[in-house]
Amino acid sequence: MSFSHREIESKWQKYWEENKTFKTEEDETREKFYALDMFPYPSGAGLHVGHPEGYTATDILSRMKRMQGYNVLHPMGWDAFGLPAEQYAIDTGNSPAEFTEKNINTFRRQIKSLGFSYDWDREVNTTDPDYYKWTQWIFIQLYNKGLAYIDEVAVNWCPALGTVLANEEVIDGKSERGGHPVERRPMKQWMLKITEYADRLLEDLEELDWPESIKDMQRNWIGRSEGAEVTFSVDGHDDTITVFTTRPDTLFGATYMVLAPEHKLVDAITTSEQKQAVESYKKEVATKSDLERTELAKEKTGVFTGAYAINPVNGEKVPIWIADYVLVSYGTGAIMAVPAHDERDYEFAKTFDLPIKEVVSGGVIEQEAYTGDGPHVNSEFLNGLSKEEAIEKMIQWLEAEKKGTKKVTYRLRDWLFSRQRYWGEPIPVIHWEDGTMSTVPEDELPLELPKMSEIKPSGTGESPLANATDWLEVVDPVTGKKGRRETNTMPQWAGSCWYYLRYIDPDNERMIADPEKLKKWLPVDIYIGGAEHAVLHLLYARFWHKVLYDLGVVPTKEPFQKLYNQGMILGENNEKMSKSKGNVVNPDDIIDSHGADTLRLYEMFMGPLDASIAWSTTGLDGARRFLDRVWRLLVDENTEEKSSKIVNGEGSPELKRAYHQTVKKVTEDFEELRFNVGISQLMVYVNEAYKQEELPLDQAEGFVKLLSPVAPHLAEELWSKLGHEGTIAYEPWPTYDEAFLVEDEVEIVVQHNGKVRAKVVVAKDATKEQMEEAALANERVKESIDGKTVRKVIVVPGKLVNIVAN
């Protein structure tokens, strides 16, 4: 006999919605728990089975915490700006707003059908003007603090698409979408000064309960390095070139210098003989993205400028080259090359036959670069010193001679914040005809996106908003001065930088959120989502949070106390699910055939939450069979009422022990996100219960409570079958008694001359004499020692009896 999942699930979803079961009230008497999911981008494809994995995990925690008496905040919303909606709109002539709304409705329906306990009154949508009013407000605060500025930077410009592309959108010098040529060109862009927060973003990672791998990715992305800036003069010119190096101790081994092709001095120092070669190389490099240029495996290319620099430490002339592996955006856009002790420089020197000079002993320079430590050689006042000593001494020398200085640099660049697109938050800035600019007055926010029938890129490097003349042109009501609005929009990251704050007070029209509520709910207690957001989203959100902390808006230094990344659900063939492979599993189909509770249980039981595991229909069927067994255990198949097996009583000692062990184990495993192990223990209890004639009512009730976070619809139905009114959602979580966890009896091993002959059960606190007596009374032991003389009996309490007899 199995239960009707369609009937039960729609009944309880309706009940939760009508009764607002999961609405979060402000209640000062209870401890808070804030469980957050990474909100989804509502794509046209709808939800896939990967989404519910993380959502089910946070839902189990939220439901358990409610039953443990916590005041739980568990919200959901939509990260709805972005390129796909805009591209769809351009391709079909429809509005991105309508497309987005339709997708959100699909996502909401699908998510509700999975029975997650969200407070839907707190739903946010990044494309709602009442929401992005505050995204714009934060931008204005960044601008006022000097953290938002306009700069001319080299970007990936695609003439055919008429827009700038992110590095990730460029493959082999062509646009990922459509395969059009892409060129590097300098353009004015909005930048956010995240570099100003680099040290704090690095240091505060120590305080977070995050996976070490994610912390490391952020550390590497920020890329703090200590070293020195060294100034080289250019032979025959007044110009100097500054380089940053983490190894100033190897300065005596610098035999050439490399500039980024875009470095501002290249044209000035290139000799007439080398001009043509330099120009054509610069053209060739202009089509490559930073990622392609710095790939370690690629062949080294470069051109000599004809100019020489003077090595400040020994006065030697070193040739100045240009090469694409040096980026103008990184460090100073120039490097001193020490081929004997750097792999890239070594390859370059070998390719172009440049001198290689050993200054740290320990390697075989004829074969490869030596990057290890060792006594310095060929280095005058550094000879014999180790790396650390030599770095220290060289920095002292450079500073004394005014040829360099100690310096810390970061790999982290300022955040390129503007997009030449329509479907994003308008940047609230006005450019005036006299060359000044100002932000839109805060009382005029939100600055809404104008409705446009034609949203093709303008092709001029501006967004389609440049064509919305009525919206674009403004006049200062006080001075009569004319101005133009900023036409760039914000990137998709903007709205997701602070959404967790808006959930706390989503209808507040006066501020982001009430400070008292922020104080109560922050930081987020658990944040679950995919590892693909390890760097960008999490770093950007931490940056904005720190700015808001400095402004006194938020009370904590960090937004997310604990972070957890769920694994990926792969197709049955162990490949990533994708439409092109035809291996995508649609949750709607599973909910229809097996039920939402089965899907939730299966995704939590597949394996560890952070592992990537292949989908298995057999596993799904197994999950459903378990829920059917639970139903049959508690419900009489003829009457559809509570099973006659359920009685008011104590139950057997074995079952009592299994029950208390289950409560303890499930509680601990769920707390630690080991859902697969906790579910295994629920199965152990069900197996034990099936062996018994009777099942005590209090155990049946406790078991249903333990099951309820994983399979909430079925648990609600069983709770009502056990004679209760209303919902199980706020019933107290079961507790266990240590006294019943202890087993009264133990199994001991009996040996004859060290060989196992039998196992016997004795009382846990049996004396040595009682253990010996039980061992000698065993039939198999009697046979074994028959006719022999017992010389000695060795007893290890609670473990073993060894009879020495011959």
From Swiss-Prot:
The biological processes this protein is annotated with in GO are: leucyl-tRNA aminoacylation
Q: What class of enzyme is it?
A: ligase
The UniProt record lists the EC number as 6.1.1.4
Classification via Pfam families:
Anticodon_1, tRNA-synt_1_2, tRNA-synt_1g
Alphabetically ordered keywords of this record:
Aminoacyl-tRNA synthetase, ATP-binding, Cytoplasm, Ligase, Nucleotide-binding, Protein biosynthesis
Catalysed reaction equations from the record = tRNA(Leu) + L-leucine + ATP = L-leucyl-tRNA(Leu) + AMP + diphosphate
Entries under CDD domains matching the protein: Anticodon_Ia_Leu_BEm, LeuRS_core
Check the record and name the PROSITE patterns matching this protein. AA_TRNA_LIGASE_I
UniProt subcellular location: Cytoplasm
Q: Name one GO cellular component term.
A: cytosol
Q: Please, which domain of life does this record's source organism belong to? A: Bacteria
Q: Which residues bind ATP?
A: K579
Query: What would be an example GO MF term here?
Result: ATP binding
- Per the Swiss-Prot or TrEMBL annotation, the motif 'KMSKS' region is positioned at 576-580
Motif 'HIGH' region: list the residue ranges. Answer: 40-51
HAMAP family listed in its UniProt record: Leu_tRNA_synth_B (MF_00049_B)
Q: Which family does it belong to?
A: Belongs to the class-I aminoacyl-tRNA synthetase family.
Would you tell me the protein name for this molecule? Answer: Leucine--tRNA ligase
Q: Which organism is it from?
A: Halalkalibacterium halodurans (strain ATCC BAA-125 / DSM 18197 / FERM 7344 / JCM 9153 / C-125) (Bacillus halodurans)
What does UniProt list as this organism's lineage? Bacteria, Bacillati, Bacillota, Bacilli, Bacillales
